[in-house]
């Protein structure tokens, strides 16, 4: 079996997944462009064990919808694919591949990490989505809530497989362990405090970092009554973005800026330093389709505090075992969770071990198994035939 798997751009996550998948099926990885429009990843070319192609290069001037359509027609026909695999249904690239696959009658597999509750849902838009999802022969979903949403959109349950959202667990586990063996040296190198909560996110509104800073201020005030000052943890916010000045100003306003560290965006090789030196991980998003940083933290052996609005929470967070969930709009609740896990006798190591045990079932192998099963199913089901209405909807969406 040969599957063409499409992403906008390949970062570390995609490479780890497709490397694993290439051990089960023949994988052709295709990216629209050579750099991400969302993440400041450096080009990720090392450790690629599957055939990979960049369709339109790194120059944004080369990227246009017309160029992409021409490229698909020119490049795809000779590849003899048994199935195409697209990342959702919300962007032009995925819709273009679905349209191309319909034209040449090749089964389509839809990868999805959307849930019924990650965004406000409107009946008309949901009806349109059902028409597009109906063009898929199988699906690879992130986890349980993502599967449930695909079923709502009309995908037969027996055609849906799990495991889409995976990171290279071994990379984080091994490198975080190395960092812990030389923690003092790494802390000095990265300018890190002795004990801290770690958050890793783009500095954008949905990541809810202003409330996290407010919660940290409440936590710190409460902790001063409970613990010795040496037992109070700092907060490290890893990432960057448009809200940086607002976050810095809020930290100053609340009188906690000296304990909040913002080292900026860090490339993949640096991440284990921050996970390996942390005591616990916190992810406070008000909405999040999945939350791959939670995978990274768990693979690194950290307890996790995760917003109940994150798509990964139902499958990855076992309450009171490897972490806790919270209402991301409730500052007092977030602060209470921070206070709980930073208690001097809290079993951090046991929670961290539980994290690694849980995430072991949600790594690249699960992605590979899910993609293999989805490809087999898509081939058995065969390519969908679009109604005139579905073709018109697809064309209209591509003209937006």
Positions of predicted regions on the chain:
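Short alpha-helical donor nucleotide-sugar binding micro-motif in glycosyltransferases
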Residues: 263-266, 273-278
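Short hydrophobic beta-strand element within catalytic cores of glycosyltransferases
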Residues: 303-307
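Donor nucleotide-sugar binding/catalytic pocket of nucleotide-sugar-dependent glycosyltransferases
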Residues: 134-183, 192
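Conserved donor-binding/catalytic core segment of Leloir-type glycosyltransferases
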Residues: 191-207, 213-216
């Amino acid at each position: 079996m040969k599957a063409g798997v499409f992403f906008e751009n390949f970062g570390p996550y995609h490479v780890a997944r497709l490397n694993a998948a290439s051990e089960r099926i023949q994988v052709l990885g295709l990216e629209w462009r050579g750099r991400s429009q969302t993440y400041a990843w450096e080009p990720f070319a090392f450790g690629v064990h599957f055939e990979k192609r960049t369709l339109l290069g790194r120059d944004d001037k080369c990227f246009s919808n017309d160029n992409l359509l021409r490229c698909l027609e020119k490049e795809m026909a000779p590849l003899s694919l048994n199935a195409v695999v697209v990342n959702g249904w919300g962007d032009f690239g995925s819709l273009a591949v679905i349209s191309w696959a319909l034209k040449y009658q090749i089964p389509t597999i839809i990868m999805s990490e959307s849930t019924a509750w990650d965004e406000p849902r409107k009946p008309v838009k949901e009806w349109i989505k059902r028409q597009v999802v109906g063009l898929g022969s199988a699906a690879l979903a992130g986890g349980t809530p993502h599967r449930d949403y695909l079923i709502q959109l009309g995908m037969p349950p027996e055609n849906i497989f799990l495991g889409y959202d995976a990171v290279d667990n071994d990379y984080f586990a091994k490198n975080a362990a190395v960092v812990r063996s030389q923690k003092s040296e790494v802390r000095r190198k990265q300018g890190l405090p002795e004990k801290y909560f770690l958050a890793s996110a783009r500095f954008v509104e949905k990541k809810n970092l202003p409330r996290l800073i407010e919660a940290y201020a409440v936590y710190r005030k409460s902790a001063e009554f409970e613990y010795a000052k040496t037992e109070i943890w700092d907060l490290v916010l890893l990432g960057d973005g448009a809200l940086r000045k607002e976050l810095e100003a809020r930290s100053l306003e609340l009188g906690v800026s000296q304990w909040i560290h913002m080292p900026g965006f860090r490339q993949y090789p640096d991440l284990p330093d921050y996970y390996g030196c942390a005591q616990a991980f916190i992810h406070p998003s008000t909405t999040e389709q999945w939350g791959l940083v939670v995978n990274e933290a768990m693979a690194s052996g950290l307890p996790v505090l995760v917003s109940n609005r994150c798509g990964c929470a139902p499958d990855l967070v076992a309450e009171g075992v490897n972490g806790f969930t919270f209402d991301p709009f409730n500052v007092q609740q977030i602060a209470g969770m921070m206070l709980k896990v930073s208690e001097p006798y809290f079993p951090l190591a046991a929670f961290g071990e539980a994290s690694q045990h849980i995430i072991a079932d949600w790594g690249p192998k699960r992605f590979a198994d899910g993609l293999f099963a989805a490809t087999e199913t898509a081939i058995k089901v065969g390519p969908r035939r679009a109604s005139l209405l579905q073709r018109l909807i697809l064309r209209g969406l591509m003209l937006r």
